[in-house]
Design a protein with these regions (language model features):
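Secreted/extracellular ectodomain signature
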Residues: 32-270
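Bacterial N-terminal signal peptides
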Residues: 15-26
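Short non-domain terminal segments
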Residues: 10, 19, 41-42
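Intrinsically disordered, low-complexity regulatory regions of eukaryotic regulatory proteins
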Residues: 2-6, 151-154
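Bacterial N-terminal signal peptides that target proteins for export
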Residues: 4-16
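Short, low-complexity disordered leader/linker segments with a strong preference
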Residues: 2, 28-33
Length: 270
């Protein structure tokens, strides 16, 4: 009898050890994105801005920022491009953000699918629009796997001041610049929605009414979205409203710092 009891206790201890080991190792395995057997990261929100407001050095500068951040976390083997549109200029056609990122699917740091296709990402059909993509606060992660601090996380009146925000990583910074309409395409060229195609850090002069967040002729501005889907306008992930200007100091006044979406180019671009 004692022998049987002893064997039962030994078996029990082994089972407990296995369960404890599984509980510890399983979450670690989920976090090891890009490891053999895992789902490679193909989408992220930049953890930090370039730092010159809407002047990103054009699309090339934004793409390089995506590539550099991805490389630091071991995801540099993919080709990364920024989800940004540019507006038409004389002799230069517009570029649509949706045409820069391939066909999908895209997964975040944790291997969670954000969208299965361009149509799913943008809600191109009524059915897909009703379904929505899977980009929200818990999935719109940075390349480091962090949630972007949002509207109600750490309330502090100073989070509209760049001097405070730049040294406070948990401050509200849930606006992501896109320069795009909700379908992922560029705006017409008559009003600035892209900080002059990502080359300007200018702010509107005193002649402009800054009480609203809509663009106007001659007014420096950039269109933003919300990865957490919380904020002004329509709460869209990629096209909600404009900003107070294009300088680094102006972006935090509406709770942004110049972060943007990066996608690994999947499939063949359109």
């Amino acid at each position: 009898m004692k022998s049987e009891v002893g064997e039962d206790m030994s078996t029990f201890r082994i089972l407990v050890s296995i369960l404890v080991f599984s509980a510890v190792v399983a979450p670690m395995a989920v976090a090891q994105h890009g490891m053999p057997g895992g789902i490679p990261m193909s989408f992220f929100v930049t953890s930090e801005p370039i730092g010159d407001g809407g002047n990103l050095g054009g699309l090339a500068g934004a793409d390089a920022h995506c590539q550099n951040l991805a490389t630091v976390v071991g995801a540099g083997d993919s080709t990364w491009q920024a989800y940004l549109s540019t507006q038409a200029r004389p002799g230069k056609p517009a570029i649509n953000a949706r045409d820069r990122i391939g066909e999908g699917p895209w997964h975040n740091y944790d291997g969670v699918m954000i969208a299965s296709s361009l149509a799913h990402l943008h809600g191109d059909t009524l059915e897909l629009a009703r379904m929505g993509n899977n980009l929200h606060k818990q999935t719109g992660l940075t390349e480091k796997g962090a949630i972007v601090p949002g509207l109600y996380d750490y309330l502090d009146p100073r989070d509209r001041d760049w001097e405070y925000v730049k040294t406070t990583p948990y401050s509200n910074r849930h606006e992501v610049i896109t320069g795009s309409q909700t379908d992922g395409r560029a705006y017409p060229p008559d009003i600035d929605y892209t900080c002059d195609n990502w080359t300007s850090n200018a702010d509107p002069g005193p002649e402009f009414d800054l009480s609203g967040l809509s663009g106007g002729a001659g007014r420096p501005n950039v269109q933003i979205g919300f990865p957490d889907r919380e904020g002004g306008g329509n709460g869209s992930w990629n096209s909600s409203h404009g900003t107070r200007g294009c300088s680094q100091a102006a972006l935090p006044r509406t709770h942004g710092i110049g972060q943007f979406y990066c996608f690994a180019v999947t499939g063949e671009t359109q």
